[in-house]
C-alpha cells in the first residue's frame, strides 16, 4: 500500500502522455541518515542496555526491582549515553565496555530464568539486547566462573547483519565514495525524454500549457538499508518499472549499477538497453598504459584459441571460476614466451608464459563493446543525459529533506520517500504547466497546482 499514491499519480500521468514506457530514464542513489544518533561500540552497548532497562521498567517494574540492583543500575544507566563523556583513558573505556557486557548477560539470564514471566523475553527491547550482545560479546563459562570479552573487529558480523542502533533495527552502517553514515540508501528513477521522442512514441499532442521539453518526472523510488550496493538494485528497479508498465528503452546509469551480466540480463529479461560506463581493463598493462593488454590479443572463440601480437597462439583454454564468477583462463606456452623480444611488455612473470582471463563469450563481447563505446565523444555527449538525475536528488534533499529520515524503520522511511517523490512530481508539473524553467522549481508553485489531475 505504501506505493499506492505514487501508482495512482503515474497512472494519471500515463493517461495524459506525460510518462510512458519505451522512452529514456535515469537512476541514481544517495545516502539517507537514520533518525538515530551515530554511536561507537561503547556507546552502542551502554545505550542498548539502558533502552532495555527502560522498557522493562515500564512493562514489569515490580519484577525488575527484584531482579537487579535498581539504585546502582539507575546511576549507571539512567542518563542517555550522549549526555556525558566517556573516560578518556583507553583502559577505562575497555573496562566500562566489560561492565556493560557483564550487566547485559546478567539481565538476559534474569529475563530467561524459570521464575521470570515468559512474555518478558518476547519484548522487542529484550530481543534487541540479545542480538546486540551476540554480535559484540563473547562469554565463556567455566568452573571458575563466567568470563566476558568484547569481540575483536575481525570477529564482528558482516555490516548487513550488524545492528547500529537499539531504536532502529533496520538502520545499517554504509560506505560510499569514502563517506560513512548510519541509515539507508534511496534509489530514484526519473524520465528524461525530449519533446520529439515523447510525441512520436505516444502519438499524443503536447498538453496545453506545456512549453519546451516534457517534465522530468520520478517513476520509481526504492529504499534499502545502507549496505545494499547499487548493482544489487539494478534488477529490482527494473521489476518496479515493469510493474507500472514504465520500462524504458534506454536506461542511463552510473558504473555502480552496471556489469556485463547486468547489461546482458536487462536486455534479455526486460528489453532495456543500459547506457552506462563499465569498469576498464584492470590488467597491469592497461593500468600502466604501456605494453600489451588483453585488447592486443585476437580471440577465436570457435577454435578456443588466442593469438598474441606477434602471431603466436595459446596452448591452454580452460573454463574456471575466479572469485565466484565464471571465467575462461588462456595460457601461452612458456617456451614460446621466454625468448620473445617483447616479453617485458607482455608479462611480469619471470619464468611462465602469458595468461589471459576472460568472461564467457557473450559477456566478454558486451564488455569489450561497452569499453570501446566509452572512448567515443558522441557516446559521452549522449551519456551526459544521466547527469540530470543529480538535480533531482538535490531537489529531493533541499525541498523534502530526503537526506534525513523522519521515522524509525525501513518501511516507514520508504513510505516517507514515496510521498516525497509524489510531492516533487507535483512541484515539477506545476512549474512545467506554468512555463517555469525545468530545473528551477519552488515549493510555492504547489499552491497553484490544478488539482484536476488528482481528481
PLM features: residue spans?
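Anion-binding and metal-coordination hotspots
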Residues: 1-455
Amino acid at each position: 500500500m505504501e506505493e499506492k499514491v505514487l501508482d495512482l499519480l503515474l497512472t494519471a500521468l500515463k493517461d495524459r502522455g506525460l510518462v510512458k514506457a519505451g522512452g529514456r530514464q535515469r537512476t541514481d542513489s544517495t545516502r539517507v541518515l537514520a533518525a538515530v544518533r551515530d554511536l561507537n561500540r561503547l556507546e552502542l552497548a551502554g545505550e542498548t542496555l539502558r533502552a532495555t532497562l527502560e522498557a522493562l521498567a515500564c512493562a514489569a517494574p515490580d519484577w525488575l526491582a527484584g531482579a537487579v540492583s535498581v539504585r546502582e543500575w539507575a546511576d549507571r544507566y539512567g542518563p542517555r549515553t550522549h549526555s556525558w563523556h566517556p573516560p578518556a583513558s583507553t583502559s577505562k573505556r575497555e573496562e566500562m565496555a566489560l561492565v556493560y557486557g557483564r550487566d547485559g548477560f546478567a539481565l538476559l539470564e534474569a529475563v530467561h530464568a524459570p521464575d521470570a514471566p515468559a512474555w518478558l523475553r518476547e519484548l522487542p527491547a529484550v530481543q534487541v539486547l540479545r542480538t546486540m550482545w551476540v554480535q559484540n560479546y563473547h562469554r565463556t563459562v567455566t568452573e571458575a566462573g563466567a568470563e566476558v570479552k568484547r569481540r575483536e573487529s575481525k570477529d564482528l558480523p558482516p555490516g548487513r547483519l550488524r545492528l547500529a542502533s537499539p531504536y532502529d533495527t533496520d538502520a545499517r552502517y554504509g560506505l560510499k565514495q569514502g563517506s560513512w553514515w548510519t541509515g539507508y540508501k534511496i534509489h530514484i528513477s526519473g524520465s528524461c525524454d525530449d519533446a520529439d521522442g515523447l510525441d512520436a512514441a505516444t502519438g499524443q499532442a503536447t498538453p496545453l500549457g506545456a512549453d519546451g521539453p516534457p517534465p522530468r518526472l520520478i517513476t520509481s523510488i526504492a529504499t534499502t538499508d545502507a549496505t545494499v550496493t547499487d548493482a544489487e538494485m539494478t534488477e529490482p528497479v527494473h521489476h518496479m518499472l515493469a510493474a507500472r508498465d514504465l520500462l524504458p528503452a534506454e536506461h542511463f546509469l552510473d558504473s555502480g549499477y552496471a556489469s556485463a551480466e547486468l547489461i546482458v540480463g536487462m536486455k534479455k529479461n526486460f528489453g532495456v538497453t543500459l547506457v552506462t560506463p563499465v569498469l576498464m581493463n584492470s590488467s597491469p598493462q592497461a593500468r600502466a598504459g604501456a605494453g600489451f593488454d588483453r585488447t592486443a590479443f585476437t580471440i577465436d572463440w570457435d577454435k578456443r584459441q588466442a593469438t598474441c601480437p606477434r602471431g603466436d597462439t595459446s596452448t591452454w583454454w580452460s573454463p574456471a571460476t575466479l572469485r565466484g564468477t565464471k571465467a575462461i583462463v588462456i595460457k601461452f606456452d612458456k617456451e614460446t614466451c621466454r625468448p620473445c623480444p617483447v616479453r617485458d611488455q607482455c608479462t611480469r612473470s619471470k619464468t611462465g608464459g602469458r595468461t589471459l582471463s576472460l568472461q564467457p563469450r557473450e559477456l566478454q563481447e558486451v564488455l569489450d563493446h561497452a569499453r570501446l563505446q566509452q572512448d567515443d565523444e558522441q557516446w559521452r555527449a549522449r551519456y551526459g543525459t544521466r547527469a540530470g538525475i543529480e538535480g533531482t536528488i538535490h531537489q529531493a534533499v533541499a525541498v523534502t529533506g530526503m537526506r534525513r529520515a523522519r521515522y524509525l524503520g525501513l518501511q516507514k522511511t520508504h513510505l516517507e520517500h514515496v510521498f516525497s517523490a509524489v510531492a516533487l512530481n507535483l512541484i515539477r508539473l506545476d512549474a512545467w504547466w506554468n512555463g517555469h524553467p525545468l530545473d528551477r522549481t519552488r515549493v510555492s508553485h504547489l499552491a497553484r497546482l490544478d488539482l484536476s489531475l488528482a481528481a
